[in-house]
Amino acid sequence: MTNRIGLFKKSWILGVAILVFQGCGTTKTLVFADKASVIAKINLINVVDDKVNVILDPAAFVADTVSFFIPKTVPGTYSDDNYGKYIEQFKALDYKGGELKVEKLDDNTWRIINAKDLDKIDYWVNDTYDTEVEVSDPVFSPSGTNILKGKNFMLNLHGFVGYFDGLEEIPYSLEISAPDGLEPVTSLVKGIQDVNRPETDIFVANRYFEVIDNPIMYSNPSTETFQVNDIAVTLSVYSPNGLFTAASLKAGMEKMMRGQKAFLGDINSTKHYTIILYLSNMDDNDAIGFGALEHHTSTVVVMPEQISKERLEEAIFDTVAHEFFHIVTPLTVHSNEIQYFDFNHPKMSMHLWMYEGTTEYFANLFQIQQGLITEEDFYQRLMEKIERSKTYDDRMSFIVMSKNILEEPYKKNYANVYEKGALINMALDINLRELSGGEKGVLWLMKELSKKYGDSKPFEDDKLIDEIIAMTYTEIGEFFNTNVIGNTPIDYDAYWKKVGLQTTEQEEATGYFFDGEVPYIDVDPANDNAIFVREGIQLNSFFNNLGAKGGDIIKSVDGKLTNLVNIRLLIGQSINWDSDKEIVMVVQRGDEEITLSGKVGVPTLDVVKLVPMEGAGEQQIKLREAWLKG
């Protein structure tokens, strides 16, 4: 996240804005490239070999060479995805239609020679969804692309449209030609429609960031719009087998977002918000990375289609709740590293504890404050986050991890931003409530920061924590220095005591392969549908007593090779297992094949519960009420 965007200063601006260019035997009037918009044309009608054609038409360059980029990474992904790998047949064309010399410098960069003669560039784009099971480092589906001729086009535009070096701040005009029957859903501003080209949609953006910040989905529309106070929300659903519609999900979504808006109060940075829901049929050429990617005024959510409505709604609501709260941070409150994001040489911010942690904390806190879940549900979520956070390095500085999140060993700890990141905010919230007599919490803090910073006013990355301390209490500085900047694990029991809670251990019954709807095993589509024991979760007594570990690949059970069919049968049979049944399970652990055996027993799970403390004092109960009820 560097300062290329917004800080590029042209050293060659001349006193005139118009040149007369001689070409093709005619006179062509051209504006300097830094004075006009880039026109990007995407053709969704003439799909060839699952690829679409893209043409970018800038104005005239005066430099001898110019570099063209497709993003290496984009905000919110915290990963190097190299979207340029999906670009093929790249050509730079002069005004006579001839090809200019192009040097490909890396996966995402093309240097165009004799750029003064450049008329346009022309290339083909392959999608990412149908490669997810083929590559070792697939693009996360919500930030990926889909080309399904005549049915669906998921246009995360960083996968289709690039930028010329130094021209990130000039306007873009997108001209997208689409088949009859497919309609676009996006928060991107529509331009003036050309009546002579009814098949072409025109969109406009003030700068390149606005292009990639506004995904578009073309599909046979299933769309609903509803009003949440002063925010117009659009929900669009693509369900390939027609199992779900926007209408079927609208009521629950509207209820949830009304709760979010009530929680946020006067924090608001948008008048419209678009939720794009893509449901995957789980074929080999479809999306398998489930989750969401946030944008300023929209979010892309990818989920499996073959689940119950209840489970889908639960997954969507938790996911969208998180993504919607990103309008607070980083979409409103953010650093220079995000405001001036460098898509190909990113400089990362040190504040993932806030960008993802605060957001995830709010996504859970608002539900208890708005009466959508019970206190017991909220406590259970916190305990689950503590349990999952233990699978990461608990002595890693969150500030150091965040600043270096694209590199190892920090990269493999990224998912902890949703676990310990949320818990950091919980501790900060309780500290603020305690020090302010219950009046101030993290929501108050974010409201204060949003008054000072906003969409076009970033903060300085290395000064934010000092600013927070100055706004609050010296004890908050001690907390940050110890548990966020420093590497000391959080003493959760101390925080439970502050609010009159305590932990207690209970043994609960589970299934052999499932705890309710939560599986202990999973399938790896990238490894011939291998069945493996899930990592990062607490295993039940069945797996623990056998000696199984997270990550073990189950090769066979009782002499029968495991595959998708056999494992389903085995799960069904396990319902009637006798506790004295002997079982032999062969697993692959790394390069070693290990035989595990023993009685199946009665499967149980040791669960740590968070419960009210007997004899809690009045101050503890008051602080708990302030924390949970706001």
Question: In which residue ranges do the predicted regions lie?
Answer:
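Bacterial N-terminal signal peptides that target proteins for export
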Residues: 2-13
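C-terminal motif of bacterial Sec signal peptides marking the signal peptidase cleavage site
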Residues: 20-23
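Bacterial signal peptide processing site
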Residues: 25-27
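Early extracytoplasmic/domain-onset interaction patches
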Residues: 29-73, 154-158
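Juxtacatalytic substrate-recognition/specificity segment
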Residues: 56, 222-351
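Non-catalytic architectural context of zinc metalloproteases
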Residues: 80-89, 93-94, 99-258, 262-270, ...
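C-terminal recognition in membrane/secretory proteostasis and scaffolding
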Residues: 363-364, 372-630
